[in-house]
């Protein structure tokens, strides 16, 4: 979380009012996932950083939030060592019965950049079709 902190701290100095900073985290920030220790801890720190920066930058007219998407089937997943675990997560059904896509994440980012979202401050938006609501 150090790089996003340094970048955000410095770029905020020149950002105009009504600007946005959106961090991308993951469910591994609050749930323990196999082979995800370093990333999970970093994502948890990034969510905390999001809240602290949101309070610090809100008076300057800069909104800071984070987005926490579930797994998305992309080429990046082939670099994870636990392919069977990844496959089972991707095959799980969420209440929407739909796989998450990059477009789903982009739409939330666009929403957070719009003026109508100006009172959403310091929040972590979970995008998973309700998957985290269902006990497994």
Model region roles, listed by residue range:
Residues 68-79, 127:
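Short, flexible catalytic-loop segment of classical short-chain dehydrogenase/reductase
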Residues 13, 55-59, 118:
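Alpha-helical segment proximal to the catalytic Tyr-Lys
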């Amino acid at each position: 979380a150090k790089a996003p902190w340094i970048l955000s701290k410095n770029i905020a100095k020149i950002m105009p009012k009504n600007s946005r900073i959106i961090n991308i985290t993951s469910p591994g920030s609050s749930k323990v996932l196999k082979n995800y220790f370093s990333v999970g801890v970093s994502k948890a720190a990034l969510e905390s950083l999001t809240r602290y920066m949101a309070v610090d930058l809100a008076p300057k007219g800069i909104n800071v939030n984070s987005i926490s998407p579930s797994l998305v089937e992309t080429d990046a997943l082939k670099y994870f060592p636990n392919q069977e675990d990844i496959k089972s997560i991707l095959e799980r059904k969420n209440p929407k019965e739909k796989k998450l896509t990059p477009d789903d994440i982009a739409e939330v980012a666009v929403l957070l950049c719009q003026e109508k979202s100006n009172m959403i401050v310091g929040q972590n938006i979970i995008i998973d079709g309700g998957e985290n609501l269902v006990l497994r």
